[in-house]
């Protein structure tokens, strides 16, 4: 037992079994196993030789290049010197042309990004058969880019150019007619209003009924009109141009003139991103409209330098990135009606631009550090209202017309023959009927293949207690009588009527006659053959919606009738008791 204990016992500090670690300069030295001798392989030697050989070759090339340059300088003559100067001058002029073309994108600070945008624009022009140049109806000449039009007309493939006058709902009818008459002397021009249903992804509203039945209230809605005329123009090109396959239609123009909104309106869905700031569209995007037409969306182009006031007022440059926002506001005050601007911002009695901006900053609470009113922030707020359309404006066409330098009489004649300009003028006249001046209570919604009659009857009716209490409109459908608290006419496609929701003494009854729920095949057959399938699907969808609504209304009416019968039965029982 004693041997086992001594065997398992750890040796003490003074014993031989415990050796102290060696120290060197006061630090412990740990013993490391000796490393094996390094073996030099043949591959390492070969790689080292290859590197040396490569280095010698590079040095030899540099020496030869220096020798050739010295020999060239020795035998250089005046003639070769002049040729070299001319060559460098040509290269410099080519670079200047590229820089001028890149100035079409001054809102981009990065030169690489500007080059990328220009490449996207050139791709759209190269791949397209027809180019749609979108113009703002408030300032069509200011939105035209003659440099871009010249590029399109000079491109290979005999490109065609069509002008689209967008946002005609923001301009009086007479001014739009004058601009159409002015622009049709040069190129085919189509009046258009894009859909403004930004929160809806599919089934954007498009006006397909006869436009002579529309009124000014149509422009206050979010529906699109002018699309049928534009599709007819493209169809004429496919027919007269003898196009066998599909065509590509490029959509170009300044930022925020409505290029992407036009594509979404034709597609009737949110196919492209839209926004109220420049630079939303960054790359070319192809949208399939049907099997014959494909649309190409391009980034916005901007002619002129970055400091031009007109470019800023056309919303070609982001307002928040402006270094001097006061100068454009001064231009607005010089050209616009001061009374309307004063009433809009609630300021008056200002003499200079600084006084006006100080008053606006006071109204909006725009201050710097120390409580000083910020004229720059007030100017940016005014410019934001300007570019968003809150401050209305429009320009007049020139009194006399002269063809631009890039357009000739032959080009105008060719465009007139290809796109059937007379048919386009008649279609524009029909579209302009929507701008008729006058008050109207009708609201035109989506195309509805069903016809619904709403007749007002003056026959007496027994008062319904719930209808009188809730002050709702009384309806009569067939043999059932009931009420609806807030009828949604916009969804049902009914014309808007002046309804007295307070039940008068001679109660009026709205009788909704029975309507044929089948799709109107005759109206569908009258549409474009390419759109008949979509029209039939829309008709069937509306049929299901109306069927659900009628079932829901019938259920409500039956419940109300049953509740009335229960109340009458209880009152009789109480009287008997």
Swiss-Prot record:
Molecular-function GO term, any one: GTP binding
InterPro entries assigned: G_CP_dom, GTP-bd, GTP-bd_ortho_bundle_sf, P-loop_NTPase, TRAFAC_YlqF/YawG_RiboMat
Domain annotation CP-type G: ranges: 118-304
Comp. bias (Basic residues): 1-30
GO cellular component terms, A-Z: cytosol; nucleolus; nucleoplasm; telomerase holoenzyme complex
Protein name: Guanine nucleotide-binding protein-like 3-like protein
GN (gene name): Gnl3l
Subunit relationships: Interacts with MDM2; this interaction, which occurs in the nucleoplasm, stabilizes MDM2. Indirectly interacts with TP53, via MDM2-binding. Interacts with TERF1; this interaction probably occurs in the nucleoplasm and is increased during mitosis, when the nucleolus is disassembled. This binding may promote TERF1 homodimerization. Interacts with TERT.
Coiled-coil parts of chain: 43-103
Family of the protein in this entry: Belongs to the TRAFAC class YlqF/YawG GTPase family.
Keywords, in A-Z order: Coiled coil, GTP-binding, Nucleotide-binding, Nucleus, Ribosome biogenesis
Job of this protein: Stabilizes TERF1 telomeric association by preventing TERF1 recruitment by PML. Stabilizes TERF1 protein by preventing its ubiquitination and hence proteasomal degradation. Does so by interfering with TERF1-binding to FBXO4 E3 ubiquitin-protein ligase. Required for cell proliferation. By stabilizing TRF1 protein during mitosis, promotes metaphase-to-anaphase transition. Stabilizes MDM2 protein by preventing its ubiquitination, and hence proteasomal degradation. By acting on MDM2, may affect TP53 activity. Required for normal processing of ribosomal pre-rRNA. Binds GTP.
Superkingdom to which the source organism belongs: Eukaryota
Chain residue ranges for the region called Required for nucleolar localization: 9-28
Annotated residues for binding of GTP: 166-169, 253-260, 297-300
Region described as Disordered: 1-75
Annotated PANTHER family: GTP-BINDING PROTEIN-RELATED, GUANINE NUCLEOTIDE-BINDING PROTEIN-LIKE 3-LIKE PROTEIN
Subcellular location: Nucleus, Nucleolus
Gene3D superfamilies (UniProt xref): 1.10.1580.10, P-loop containing nucleotide triphosphate hydrolases (3.40.50.300)
Domain free text: In contrast to other GTP-binding proteins, this family is characterized by a circular permutation of the GTPase motifs described by a G4-G1-G3 pattern.
Ranges annotated as biased composition (Basic and acidic residues): 42-75
Listed GO biological process terms: negative regulation of protein sumoylation; negative regulation of protein ubiquitination; negative regulation of telomere maintenance via telomerase; positive regulation of protein localization to chromosome, telomeric region; positive regulation of protein-containing complex assembly; regulation of protein stability; ribosome biogenesis
Signal sequence interval, chain numbering: none
Keyword Nucleotide-binding in annotation: yes
